Amino acid sequence: MIAGYFQLICTQSVEEFTAPVAGEYKLQCWGAGNSQKGGGYSYGDITLISSIKLYVCVGGQGKNHNGYKGGLGGYNGGGKGGDGSRINAFGNAHDYIGGSGGNGATHIGFHTGLLNKFESDYKTQLLLVAGGAGGFSQGNYGLGFGGGSEGGKPARIEIYDSSGTLMIPSQYGTSANQNSGYKFGEGQQGMTKSKHGNSGAEGSGGGGGGLYGGFSPQEEGDYTNWAGGGGSGYANSSLLTNAMTIAGDTNFPSPYGGMEKGHLDDDGACIVTQISF
């Protein structure tokens, strides 16, 4: 380990960090993402004395479906994927694929707890949030990247007929942002389907975790395979300098070196680096 460099991974728990010496530290967070849509990135600098504790919660990747069962949401706010319908158009038993779980956010704060425990005091106790990406539905990976000041919107894809003519254009839901979303710290569960539908019997993806979690529209019937929206990020400029939150459809540094466009197909990450004494 490089002196003054600390990298934290997802352990499904809140980790405590105490600065080994007083000085200025750079904080970096990455939200979890799936194979198609990336988590966001947030960073900022803070001066710490050696007695100050920070609490880091690294978001987990949402799980893929297990047959008709929707995947579990990722640690720290990812919404569960919706279950697929178990009946076809003729009323016979048939299992349709479930949606994947939304991905968890990564955050750093001055007290312990998952992100949803900061709702009442986030302006004074929460330093950074990197939003998690939304989960996907069968054949629909949507736009649900993690935030950024705004997460990617929940989406359903355009539908074409057999001749290639556009029948139904893409449709987008409401994005999570700095002031609203599904819930503070939590993405919405994907819709569980109870009946057959053309491109609508499969479970919808869960919303990503974030300052405000992403939505997953609660619709069923034809053309309702929604990919969940991403959660929003947050950088507390009152407590940090050089603070910024960047959406997961943008190029930014990777926790493994180099650059990446969204934090894809991975749990979140957190790096704390001492930059001056």
Feature roles, as predicted:
Residues 1-33:
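GGW-centered surface loops in extracellular recognition modules
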Residues 8-11, 37, 99-101, 263-264:
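A short catalytic or substrate-binding loop motif that flags glycine-/basic-rich loops and adjacent residues
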Residues 14-25, 44-52, 108-121, 272-277:
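Extracellular and analogous surface-interaction loops
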Residues 24, 51-54, 122-127, 208, ...:
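Loop/turn elements at helix/coil->beta-strand transitions in domains of secreted/extracellular proteins
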Residues 31-111, 135-165, 208, 213-243:
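Glycine-rich strand-loop-strand elements at beta-sheet edges
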Residues 105, 110-116, 121-194:
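Chymotrypsin/trypsin-fold serine protease catalytic domain
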Residues 186-277:
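Extracellular low-complexity, Gly/Ser/Thr-rich intrinsically disordered linkers
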